[in-house]
Structures are given as C-alpha cells and as structure tokens.
Amino acid sequence: MSMRTARLERSTSESSVLVEVNLDGTGKSEIETTVPFYNHMLTALSKHSLIDLRVKASGDTDIDVHHTVEDVAITLGEVLRTALGDKAGIRRFGEATIPLDEALAHAVVDVSGRPYLVHSGEPAGQEYHLIGGHFTGSLTRHVFEAITLHAQICLHMRVLAGRDPHHIVEAQFKAFARALRSAVESDPRVDGIPSTKGLL
C-alpha cells in the first residue's frame, strides 16, 4: 500500500488553516488552533486513532471561535478523504464504545463515500455549555458534521451517559478516534476495494 498521507492549506476571510495527516502513523500530533479545548480534543483524536496529525490554524476568534473550529474540521475531512485514496485494502467499518469517567460514547464509522451523520444522546443543555472558556457544546456536532461531509464517511455517534460537559465531548472524540482507526486500517485479507460495487 502506498503512503497514505495528505496536506491541505485552506484560507478564507475568516480563517487560515493547514492540516497534514498520515493514516499509518503512531498518533503523533502538533496542534495549534488558538482554541485550547479544541487543541485538546484534536490531540486526543490523533493519539487514539494512531493518525499522525498536524494542525496550524488562526482566525477571527475575537468575534467567535466557530469559524476557526469549523474550518479546521472541514480541512481535516478533506485531507482524510485525500489520504484514503481509492480506499483499496481498508477494513472500511469501525466501531468503538469509550468511557470517560461518568460519560460513555458509542461511535460507528463506515468509510462509504456517502457522507451521513447521526448524532444523538447528548443531555439537554449540553449545546449551551462553554467548555474551556471558548468552546461551546454545540460545536461538537458541527465538527462531526464537517468531518463526515468532507471526508465522505458515515458516522453514527451516540452519547450513552454523561454529566460533565467536558467529559461528554471528550468521550465522543475518543470514540470517533478508535472507530476511525479500525475503519481506515489496512486488512491484508481485503482484495481491492471493500464494496460489492467496486467503488467507494
């Protein structure tokens, strides 16, 4: 299998983003988004997916962090799609249930070429919590929406339990990381593209 790496720079009037990935890495990361809690989540995503990840981003965070957070997720989705190439030899599906103390999240990934997100189970009011001083709970869904759309993957994310807003978000990122790790891993028994259609 050839090197599964990708790099993309994306600039708008609202943000400037650079993302690099190596799907066959060891979970090394270099993250700077100017949003500390988001840095923490992306570092966890890299560590638990074993995808090497470099992110350098800046934006109009004096207005709101939303633009920078979403634009990083868009760019990350695009580099994941590019790094996957034709998806030959991958497992395609991945699933993980991950706890963080009282929080529990379940993620299922299908590298299907058809973007779709089902996101459920967050407790009422989670979207209004301000985490780490900048990151509102509502951004969690926005991040997963942007990644799934631009990576062209299907993701079912379900929060099964949780009380602490930080833990609820982090459990989701870690569950996504482990499910993604399984889905993008190469499987020596897979001959070609894992689809009866012959295309993903």
From Swiss-Prot:
Query: Could you tell me which InterPro entries the record lists for this protein?
Result: IGPD_sf (IPR038494), ImidazoleglycerolP_deHydtase (IPR000807), ImidazoleglycerP_deHydtase_CS (IPR020565), Ribosomal_Su5_D2-typ_SF (IPR020568)
Q: Where in the cell is it found?
A: Cytoplasm
Q: Name one GO biological process term.
A: L-histidine biosynthetic process
- Molecular-function GO term, any one: imidazoleglycerol-phosphate dehydratase activity
Pfam name, any one? IGPD
State the coiled-coil residue ranges. none
Of the GO CC terms on this record, one is: cytoplasm
Q: Which keywords are on file for this protein?
A: Amino-acid biosynthesis, Cytoplasm, Histidine biosynthesis, Lyase
What is its EC class?
lyase
Protein origin, superkingdom: Bacteria
Q: Which SUPFAM superfamilies match?
A: Ribosomal protein S5 domain 2-like (SSF54211)
Gene3D superfamilies assigned = Imidazole glycerol phosphate dehydratase, domain 1
* Catalytic activity as recorded in UniProt: D-erythro-1-(imidazol-4-yl)glycerol 3-phosphate = 3-(imidazol-4-yl)-2-oxopropyl phosphate + H2O
Q: In which pathway does it act?
A: Amino-acid biosynthesis; L-histidine biosynthesis; L-histidine from 5-phospho-alpha-D-ribose 1-diphosphate: step 6/9
This protein's major location comes to cytoplasm
* The EC number(s) this enzyme carries: 4.2.1.19
| Family membership | Belongs to the imidazoleglycerol-phosphate dehydratase family.
Q: Which NCBIfam families match?
A: PRK00951.1-6 (NF002110), PRK00951.2-1 (NF002111), PRK00951.2-4 (NF002114)
What this protein is called in its record is Imidazoleglycerol-phosphate dehydratase
> In which organism is this protein found?
Renibacterium salmoninarum (strain ATCC 33209 / DSM 20767 / JCM 11484 / NBRC 15589 / NCIMB 2235)
> Gene name on record?
hisB
